[in-house]
Amino acid sequence: YADFEGGAPNGSFRIILLDPFDYDDREFGTTRTFMTATFSQKQVDWLISTLRDAAAKGLHVITAMHYSFGDNSLPFTEELAKPDAVFYQDPFMIPDIIDAIQHKKVLKATYRDEKGKQNIRVNEDFRDVADLDYVCHLFGHIHSRNEYRCQKTDGSKKYDILMIGEASLSTMGTALNKIIRTQGTLNEIQFSALIIDTVEKNIYRVGYGAGTTYNLSDSGRLSKISYKF
């Protein structure tokens, strides 16, 4: 993770980088395949400690990983955002942890590894933790929505967790957010800049480069996203 000092009134930030490939390299291509995610007990314990520490220090927290969190079996729809990975442990394990800290709850659960022995056990009492200001989870390309609120597949739970990602890599497939690229020009790439207002809990996003149309105006590249739930 890395901490960044910010000025008043927005405060300072902690960005936590997660590793979804936290397993023995010898398992890749056999037990574990491409576009899947597996975490270790050590990483989960570290994440919990790092989140507790950030809350105690009054830092605004952002997590980041190539994948978003959610169920990869979902269809491509606006309502049900779909990550680009199959999670071999529960895809809502880390959202469960963040949620328990946010709402100061006890979390006692075992998240089983579908492909091996990396079962994750969490037995934590977060009732005494300091207030956690969780801003968002940043991820890479996705084939459905670029901004969405994390929720259980069956709609039984909505997390106070905002997911923000980039546009899909190409116009291939059935992606909702298809973008047009012109090879050898600035419109071959696409990226965003984020401005975070921690007072009003808004994120202002500015997109650059390739867009959904060749005539995408500057106003069409601007969006305001609330993380106040």
What spans do the regions from the language model cover?
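Short, well-ordered beta-strand micro-motif
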Residues: 3-5, 17-19, 193-197
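Binuclear metal-dependent hydrolase catalytic cores centered on His/Asp/Glu-rich metal-binding motifs
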Residues: 7-58, 83-91, 221-222
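Active-site-proximal beta-strand elements of phosphoester/diester hydrolases
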Residues: 11-26, 64, 160-168, 205-208
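Divalent metal-coordination and catalytic microenvironments
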Residues: 18, 47, 63, 141, ...
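Solvent-exposed loop/turn segments at secondary-structure junctions
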Residues: 20-24, 67-71, 141-146, 168-172, ...
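Short acidic, glycine-rich surface-loop motifs adjacent to enzyme active sites
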Residues: 52-74
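Conserved beta-sheet core of the metallophosphoesterase superfamily
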Residues: 79-200
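Acidic, His/Gly-rich catalytic cores of divalent-metal-dependent hydrolytic chemistry
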Residues: 195-229
